[in-house]
Design a protein with these regions (language model features):
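Conserved, carboxylate-rich catalytic/transport cores that coordinate ions
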Residues: 1-337
């Protein structure tokens, strides 16, 4: 009806991604000309779930339960659990964990790759450091991908302030990427790139650009009154905003440490299950391992889903997605008239 706000829409996605529209619905539908994040959510959610919940046995079980929930009860959540379970099983292969038994797959690694034992021993302290590093790298990558989506979305909507000059636009990407590159080279390879021109051009300049994003965006869009009305007010407000933006870069990146935490928590919880199980005889051991697996699986599937959803909404959506569109409702004749 008429020109009331943005045009309504229905989400249209490939069959594989369609179950994940559930999360997009929960957050808010895209505006008419905004990108539909379903595919990005589907891929990143499935990957993160698998990394944080890597167990070949439990993963297959989660997938089977998901399939059954969808097949027999038509529960949409089942179609989300199915790919997540498969992803979990794949990472379980990488971690060498089957229902918490950490060395069952060693013969397979030996046969296939000639390794003495599995490549990733999660509970090994040297490995734990690598897992934490890996989690941060995933975070950096996903945050930069979210920024790229925002740049694409901004150009599509002709919102230059957001796409070019904003904290999640080209300026933000250059700033964040340059910091990551600078510190990464320094810490990992001991290569010194953070010299004065690098810092001024790639770190300070983008920050200045972000500070003046409003007038710059208006200028680029060709608006006449691009200057702020009160410079004093503008400077104070943007000073605090800039500070908040810097904090969000740090906190969003650190937030991905939960990925590493859950990899370690999973291994730790299964160790606890086996420690308890070993107190019993053979029959008691079997029962304890089965109950322990069921408990850990149920609890972790829930916790990991919540954590991944948190990462999707707070760490990624907040960078590239508004989600205040409205759903398309086909016209219907109301019966109460």
């Amino acid at each position: 009806g008429g020109a009331r706000g943005p045009a309504p829409l229905t989400l249209r996605n490939a069959r594989t991604f369609r179950p994940f529209e559930y999360f997009v619905d929960m957050y808010g539908l895209p505006r008419y000309n905004e990108i539909d994040p379903t595919a990005f959510v589907a891929i990143t959610f499935t990957l993160l779930f698998g990394i944080m919940f890597g167990d070949l046995g439990q993963g297959i079980l989660v997938a089977v339960i998901g399939w059954a929930m969808w097949h027999f009860k038509q529960m949409p959540i089942g179609r989300i659990l199915l790919p997540c379970g498969i992803s979990s099983a794949v990472f379980g292969l990488v971690y060498g964990s089957v229902f918490g038994f950490e060395h069952v797959l060693d013969p397979m690694y030996k046969a296939l790759f000639g390794l003495e034992e599995k490549p990733i021993e999660v509970m090994n302290s040297a490995m734990a450091t690598n897992i934490i590093l890996f989690a941060v790298v995933i975070g950096l990558t996903l945050i930069m991908l979210a920024m790229m989506l925002n740049i694409y979305s901004g150009f599509k909507q002709r919102n230059y302030e957001s796409a070019v000059f904003g904290p999640n636009g080209i300026a933000g990407l250059v700033f964040y990427g340059s910091l990551v590159l600078g510190f990464g080279c320094q810490l990992l390879f001991d290569v010194h790139v953070l010299n004065l021109p690098y810092v001024l051009l790639l770190i300070v300049l983008p920050l200045v650009v972000i500070f003046f994003r409003e007038p710059l965006g208006k200028l680029m869009a060709g608006e006449k009154d691009w200057k702020p009305e009160k410079w004093g007010e503008f400077i104070i407000q943007n000073f605090f905003e800039e500070f908040e933006i810097l904090l969000s870069y740090v906190s969003n990146t650190m937030s991905f440490l939960r990925v590493a935490a859950f990899v370690l928590v999973h291994a730790g919880m299964m160790m606890a299950v086996f420690a308890i199980a070993e107190l019993f005889g053979p029959l008691g051991f079997t029962i304890a391992v089965i109950i322990g697996n069921a408990l850990v699986m149920g609890m972790e599937a829930l916790l990991v889903s919540i954590q991944v959803m948190r990462l999707e909404f707070y760490e990624m959506f907040s960078r590239y997605y508004v989600g205040d569109g409205r759903a398309f409702q086909p016209l219907s004749v109301s019966a109460d008239k």
